[in-house]
């Protein structure tokens, strides 16, 4: 341990706060919180740790700390510091798992929509639903029962929905605010768990229609009742109080934490969320960090109640999230927490079983690949591929596999700078030169094996740069494809000799993964550049659009297709003046210009 670390550890306060671990570059690699800073920070440098924590500690060369007045303040500060520094060893929940909601818009003539994008607008949101099918089935039923506007833009004449009795035709008739409010209130009542009352009202209307000999109307009402029954049958009631609540459980093993969340809506368990991540703190601290990030995710509404395991400080959760938090001692809520804990434990056990089995196979594949090539075990493999469809936007990509697994933080993209036109060999020479010149200059780790996606010419070009120009002697192999552009075999040596691998072997499978991954990475980069150039060229002739506005539009919309579908308002929201937005809209609407 560095002497200055010992000195800083000796003067740590016994107060709550946050600590920031730094590596040799001064980069914050981990942020944590503690009830007692002195005890928590010192624990990293004493006692035994699992492999993941050892890797973290091995990179720490300095730390800072911030004293707070309470545990709650430390928790809030920790989340802000994680967002600011994005440390590589911290949990960072991805905001990519979104659930569908049913939305009643706040328009003068409101509509029912399904959305995964919950905004802070005046609309009313109901959900989340476990999947799109469930949301669509419910909306379809509501569309049949309640005649709100269906069209996104007001047509000039009544549509089919009006003739089907599913719309009041505000496009041509006056529909008052009171009429809309009455319909919206009925929908809200249904979505808030009042389906039994709605069903009873429909049943009464059905019998009345039958007595009046209005058999078509009675049949429509009967079908609506059947649809309600079908949808509600799929959702098993587990709580009788109809309170919306999220029930949390967790398990910890081998330096990993699994958190399971059960979403209970209107008394029904509709879905669960499973998250697994490495943990470097005490389990309770890791859980609090998780739950803070969980509700920062825009797809996770805070329910009326949050139910947490007995080991968690529910009062702290309640003050932090500003929502009721409970630790059940008995009853159905306690049963649900125990079920969530049990599921978390099972999920971790399955993960470790699969990891152990996969790691054994992967390590064996790397060892066998080295033996077949006659080299030392290639723990670090770097692979290169070029991409230049139709000679435009030539690029190359490098990926790294460490012990048979992709190390995505090590991936690199290259725009070809010195080569004119599509010349694969010269492109390969340029990229190999750039990669390993920098590796030597910055003392970066060198690979045990370099794989070039190509034949003898590509291999010769890369070898020439590596050996004759840079003086590096690293085993290098060419990855040859068959006529279907699939992995065939390797070539290695001078002159290159083929190395045939059994197609059902783990080492062949490893090569396939490397080839697919480097090809995917290269072609994705090429498409990004090509897409940008297509958009920019398409906007070249529009008055008032310079390079700055092109970049703004590209960043906001991402593709020409989305721009063609956008309205004038959406162009204004992207930062365009209204007159420019109208010009862009008119230009893109004219298909002859594109």
UniProtKB/Swiss-Prot annotation:
Keywords: Cytoplasm, DNA damage, DNA excision, DNA repair, Excision nuclease, SOS response. Pfam families: GIY-YIG, UVR, UvrC_RNaseH, UvrC_RNaseH_dom. GO terms for biological process: nucleotide-excision repair; SOS response. Coiled coil: none annotated. SUPFAM superfamilies: C-terminal UvrC-binding domain of UvrB, GIY-YIG endonuclease, RuvA domain 2-like. GO terms for cellular component: cytoplasm; excinuclease repair complex. Residues 14-91 form the GIY-YIG domain. It is found in: Cytoplasm. GO terms for molecular function: DNA binding; excinuclease ABC activity. Residues 196-231 form the UVR domain. Interacts with UvrB in an incision complex. The UvrABC repair system catalyzes the recognition and processing of DNA lesions. UvrC both incises the 5' and 3' sides of the lesion. The N-terminal half is responsible for the 3' incision and the C-terminal half is responsible for the 5' incision. Belongs to the UvrC family. HAMAP family: UvrC. This is UvrABC system protein C. It comes from Bacillus cereus (strain ATCC 10987 / NRS 248). The lineage of its organism: Bacteria, Bacillati, Bacillota, Bacilli, Bacillales.
């Amino acid at each position: 341990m560095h002497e200055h670390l010992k000195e800083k550890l000796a003067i740590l306060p016994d107060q709550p706060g946050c600590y920031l671990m730094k590596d040799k570059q001064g980069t914050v690699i981990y942020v944590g919180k503690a009830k007692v800073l002195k005890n928590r920070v010192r624990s990293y440098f004493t006692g035994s740790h699992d492999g993941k924590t050892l890797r973290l500690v091995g990179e720490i060369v300095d730390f800072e700390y911030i004293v707070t007045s309470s545990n709650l303040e430390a928790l809030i500060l920790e989340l802000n510091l994680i967002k600011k520094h994005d440390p590589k060893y911290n949990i960072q929940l991805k905001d990519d798992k979104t659930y569908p909601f049913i939305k009643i818009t706040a328009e003068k003539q409101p509509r029912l929509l399904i959305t995964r994008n919950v905004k802070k607008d005046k609309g009313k949101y109901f959900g989340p639903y476990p999947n799109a099918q469930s949301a669509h089935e419910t909306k379809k039923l509501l569309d049949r029962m309640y005649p709100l506007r269906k069209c996104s833009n007001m047509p000039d004449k009544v549509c089919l929905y009006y003739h089907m009795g599913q719309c009041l035709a505000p496009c041509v008739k006056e529909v008052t605010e009171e009429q809309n409010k009455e319909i919206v209130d009925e929908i809200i009542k249904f979505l808030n768990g009042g389906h039994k009352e709605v069903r009873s009202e429909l049943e009464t209307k059905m019998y009345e229609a039958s007595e009046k000999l209005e058999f078509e109307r009675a049949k429509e009402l009967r079908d609506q009742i059947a649809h309600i029954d079908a949808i509600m049958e799929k959702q098993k009631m587990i709580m009788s109080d109809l309170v919306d609540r999220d029930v949390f459980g967790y398990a910890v093993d081998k330096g990993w934490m699994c958190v399971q969340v059960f979403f209970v809506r209107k008394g029904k368990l509709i879905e669960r969320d499973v998250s697994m991540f490495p943990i470097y703190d005490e389990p309770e601290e890791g859980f609090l960090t998780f739950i803070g990030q969980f509700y920062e995710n825009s797809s996770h509404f805070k329910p009326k109640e949050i139910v947490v395991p007995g080991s968690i400080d529910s009062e702290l959760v309640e003050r932090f999230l500003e929502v009721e938090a409970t630790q059940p001692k008995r009853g159905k809520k306690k049963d649900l927490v125990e079920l969530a804990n049990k599921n978390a434990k099972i999920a971790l056990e399955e993960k470790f079983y699969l990891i152990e089995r996969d790691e054994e196979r992967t390590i064996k594949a790397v060892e066998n690949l080295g033996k077949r090539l006659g080299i030392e075990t290639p723990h670090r493999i770097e692979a290169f591929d070029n991409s230049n469809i139709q000679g435009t936007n030539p690029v190359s990509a490098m990926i790294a596999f460490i012990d048979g697994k992709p190390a995505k933080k090590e991936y690199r993209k290259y725009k070809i700078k010195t080569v004119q036109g599509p010349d694969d060999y010269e492109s390969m020479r340029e990229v190999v030169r750039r990669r390993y010149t920098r590796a030597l200059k910055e003392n970066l780790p060198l690979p045990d094996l370099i794989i070039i996606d190509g034949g003898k010419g590509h291999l010769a070009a890369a070898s020439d740069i590596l050996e004759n120009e840079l003086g590096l002697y690293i085993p290098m192999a060419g990855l040859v494809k068959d006529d279907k552009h699939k992995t065939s075999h390797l070539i290695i040596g001078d002159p290159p000799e083929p190395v045939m691998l059994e197609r059902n072997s783990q080492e062949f499978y490893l090569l396939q993964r490397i080839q697919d991954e480097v090809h995917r990475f290269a072609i994705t980069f090429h498409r990004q550049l090509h897409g940008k150039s297509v958009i920019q060229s398409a906007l070249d002739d529009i008055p008032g659009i310079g390079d700055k506005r092109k970049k703004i539009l590209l960043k906001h919309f991402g593709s020409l297709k989305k721009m063609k579908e956008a309205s004038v308002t959406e162009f204004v929201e992207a930062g365009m003046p209204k007159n420019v937005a109208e010009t862009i809209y008119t230009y893109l609407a004219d298909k002859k210009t594109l």
